[in-house]
Amino acid sequence: MGDASASTSAPATPTSTLICREDGNDLFSADPADDDGGGGSGGDWELSIADDDHVLLMDRDDEYLALMLSKERCAGGGGGGERGDEEEEEMVEEWMKNARAWCVGWIVKTNAGFRFSLKTAYVAVTYLDRFLARRCVDRDKEWALQLLSVACLSLAAKVEERRPPRLPEFKLDMYDCASLMRMELLVLTTLKWQMITETPFSYLNCFTAKFRHDERKAIVLRAIECIFASIKVISSVGYQPSTIALAAILIARNKETAPNLDELKSVVGSLWQQLDTGHVYSCYNKMMIQEDRSMQSTTEVASSGVSVAHIGGSEDSAMGGANNATTLEATPDKKRKRLHSPQRQ
């Protein structure tokens, strides 16, 4: 992974990219009802929103959305500008897919334990994916992935949270603060100190602005659930944030039938031609596969009587356990028809 302690030259004003942009209205907060500080067991946590409905349901006009899409295209890809490719994804070794899934699970679970916002967890996963898109990790250095996960969550908290924890608060006995700080520096330099990251959440209000007021809130929350349900298998740099948001909304809006081009147009209006519909449908299909797997897993757990708290294993599981993880296969029963991108009209 390279020498994290190597001397690097940072920009003249690097801290400007780490300024927290909180405005006090957190759309993606952990459930405040549970004040035990433990964040639940096994990553059990609920999605909730601020009481200020006008924040969640703020109207966005087409001009604003067009500006967001234009800026996204200039950035070049999902998250940090690294564009994913399905053929390259198929070439990723299975152990790396499983190791990444472990890292994402740890980030989401620890994020809940600290009661950070959901956006913080997503930003941390984005840092992880951007780093892995630029640096290779040897199979015999899985410990470095765990250290990387801590560094990504720590940096995301410094960007997104008002009170980010100190490194000792992560309570990882196997690593000292100096090692974590070196990994943080390696992440910062690898990502070129570009730490302000666009997320799919920025687009949820825009894409639901034309829906009925009484259904928008439920659709946004359902879309957020879809995004986090698929975060272990869909790289945040594989699709642009707008693509992920739109695919999640299409799933949240209609559970029974696959959307068509007319429904896509009804969501984004005249701006649909600025989107890569092929990528939207590809992302939709992957999310639906994960939905099928989640439903199958939930059914199997319910029928077996196993507590949901035990899903995902112990927090102290070794990274090597990811190598032996069994990849679930999508159940062939009751699967929705996969989409194919239609011709532009």
Curated annotation (Swiss-Prot):
Question: Per its UniProt record, what PANTHER family does this chain match?
Answer: CYCLINS
Q: Which InterPro entries match?
A: Cyclin (IPR039361), Cyclin-like_dom (IPR013763), Cyclin-like_sf (IPR036915), Cyclin_N (IPR006671)
Q: Which SMART domains match?
A: CYCLIN
Record-stated family = Belongs to the cyclin family. Cyclin D subfamily.
Query: Where is the region Disordered?
Result: 1-44, 313-345
Compositional bias of type Basic residues: which residue ranges? Answer: 334-345
Q: Recite the UniProt keywords alphabetically.
A: Cell cycle, Cell division, Cyclin
Q: Where is the composition biased (Low complexity)?
A: 1-17
Q: What is this protein called?
A: Cyclin-D5-3
Q: What molecular function does GO assign, one term?
A: cyclin-dependent protein serine/threonine kinase regulator activity
What Gene Ontology cellular-component terms does the record carry? cyclin-dependent protein kinase holoenzyme complex; cytoplasm; nucleus
This protein's record includes keyword Secreted: no
Q: Tell me which Gene Ontology terms the entry assigns under biological process.
A: cell division; G1/S transition of mitotic cell cycle
A Pfam match is Cyclin_N
Q: Species name for this entry?
A: Oryza sativa subsp. japonica
